[in-house]
């Protein structure tokens, strides 16, 4: 049974086409991985099929009474919202029904007997609906899901703006679970999730009987949960049966076959053109030349897609620092309450350290405390000599209205326009991206702009807070290569063992010193 039909969909921004004449069917129970490079339009596609964005052309048709749950990259959680209020908002439609029922009861004293009977019948129908949906057990349901996701210990009255990125993702995921939609749309759900949360999500999706569409650049995760791949590339959407590894096998084979056919056809075209050029003027061979020209005119010429710009990340290294990068003495990190026991840590020159552990235990807070962005609750941090620090934050400020060019120029005012454009292009951004406002780019493209700032500044210590979030496969592979070759030291928060394996000299498990477990 078809849950969703998309026919002849085309969309773009300005003169930049994102996709053209895309058609797509979602069937009951399909577990789909939607893949493609950063900026190919995956999140845009999700926004269109959920009605958040109107397409330039095409038709989107959902089956009747289908409830859609959508977890996107940039869902707004505003100050004043609590964990409990966000989870309870999954039942807003039931609260609306309760309000409608209460309004009916309020009107009963002002109507005649016939009207009263009608209203009572209407109120009874609503009451039955509320009972059927377990309306009077909402608090218990919210508590059950919060406990399963490890949110109950944080407190249901905790403001969502005080949560870590992973904790916010879990709150939004919990809301989806409570909504019990007929289809899940998940846009990079593993960003900010720790290893245990990702394992939990794997189990949940494997047991999920309904359909889902999943955007992810986490290949092991994709391989474990999907049975179909839709590849968004060069404004088209192609379907492949199997997991990501099977898709890559078939995709590379098709690509090689197309290139072989292209080369063979180009050789044939060259020979035909040579024959026509040599023989069209001679009376004896003119007819043969005309025949060859007709063959050329009728030929369906194979076109190869232009190669996507691949990023090149090469970090510049500053002078050698002193022996110690930093030392802490009785350091207790946190905001109002402590997140750690007293820490006596030290990092030496040349170490490449990865911080691991569950969400919300203080990994980002530790980075910010070392940098002096947050004052410790007690204890001290001593930075080493001759440090040139590069810092990569989890997210970019979405209120920024500058273009990519302006963003880099503000950071490096001595650069010429050519140097700015060249620096951005080396990070895998096209001319259209470079001239766009940063905030309209995809999460992966924004990350590349921030990496552009980092690699063009001389550093000898990098503090990286989940740098792989949003990056596509090519960008991740290139970043890993660049960090392995980097001559300086690295302190990095990362939840992807595949990324830091072979890169890290040390792994610090922050759960050993946190007060939150």
Language-model segments: residues:
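Post-kinase regulatory C-tail/linker adjacent to protein kinase catalytic domains
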Residues: 313-315
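Intracellular alpha-helical coupling/juxtamembrane segments of multi-pass membrane proteins
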Residues: 250-300, 305
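ABC ATP-binding cassette signature C-motif
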Residues: 1-260, 309, 318-517
């Amino acid at each position: 049974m078809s849950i969703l039909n998309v026919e002849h969909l085309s969309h773009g921004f300005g003169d930049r086409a994102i996709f053209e004449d895309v058609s797509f069917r979602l069937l009951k129970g399909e577990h789909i991985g939607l893949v493609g490079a950063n900026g190919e339009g995956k999140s845009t596609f999700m926004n269109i099929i959920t009605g958040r964005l109107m397409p330039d052309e095409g038709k989107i048709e959902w089956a009747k009474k289908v409830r859609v749950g959508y977890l996107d990259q940039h869902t707004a959680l505003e100050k004043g919202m609590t964990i409990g209020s966000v989870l309870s908002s999954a039942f807003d439609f039931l609260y609306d029904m309760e309000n409608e029922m209460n309004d009916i009861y309020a009107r009963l004293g002002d109507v005649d007997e016939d009207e009263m009977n009608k209203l009572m019948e209407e109120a009874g129908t609503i009451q039955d609906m509320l009972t059927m949906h377990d309306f009077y057990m909402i608090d218990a349901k919210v508590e059950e899901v919060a406990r399963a996701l490890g949110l109950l210990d944080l407190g249901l009255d905790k403001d969502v703006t005080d949560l870590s990125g992973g904790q916010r993702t879990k709150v939004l995921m919990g809301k989806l679970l409570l909504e019990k939609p007929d289809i899940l749309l998940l846009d990079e759900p593993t960003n900010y999730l720790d290893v245990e949360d990702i394992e939990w999500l794997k189990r949940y999706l494997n047991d999920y009987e309904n359909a889902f569409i999943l955007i992810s650049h986490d290949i092991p995760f994709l391989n474990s949960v999907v049975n179909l791949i839709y590849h968004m590339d060069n404004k088209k959407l192609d379907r492949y049966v199997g997991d990501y590894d099977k898709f890559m096998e078939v995709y590379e084979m098709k690509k090689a076959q197309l290139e072989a056919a292209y080369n063979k056809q180009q050789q044939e075209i060259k020979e035909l053109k040579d024959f026509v050029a040599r023989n069209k003027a001679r009376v004896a061979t003119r007819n043969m030349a005309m025949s060859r020209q007709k063959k050329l005119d009728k030929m369906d010429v194979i076109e190869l897609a232009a190669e996507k710009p691949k990023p090149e990340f090469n970090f510049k290294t500053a002078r050698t620092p002193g022996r110690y990068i930093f030392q802490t003495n009785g350091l207790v990190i946190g905001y109002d309450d402590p997140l750690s026991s007293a820490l006596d840590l030290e990092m030496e020159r040349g170490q490449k350290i990865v911080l691991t552990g569950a969400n919300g235990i203080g990994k980002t807070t530790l980075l910010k405390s070392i940098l002096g962005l947050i004052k410790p609750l007690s204890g001290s941090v001593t930075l080493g000599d001759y440090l040139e620090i590069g810092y990569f934050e989890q997210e970019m400020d979405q209120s920024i209205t500058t273009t990519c060019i302006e963003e880099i120029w503000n950071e490096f005012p001595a650069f010429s326009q050519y140097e700015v454009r060249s620096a951005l292009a080396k990070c895998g951004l096209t001319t259209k991206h470079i001239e766009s406002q940063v905030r309209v780019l995809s999460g992966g493209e924004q990350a590349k702009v921030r990496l552009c700032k980092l690699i063009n500044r001389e550093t000898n210590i990098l503090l990286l807070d989940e740098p792989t979030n949003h990056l596509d496969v090519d960008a991740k592979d290139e970043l890993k290569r660049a960090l392995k070759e980097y001559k300086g030291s690295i302190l990095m928060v990362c939840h992807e063992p595949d990324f830091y394996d072979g890169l890290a000299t040390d792994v610090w498990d922050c759960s050993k010193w946190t007060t939150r477990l």
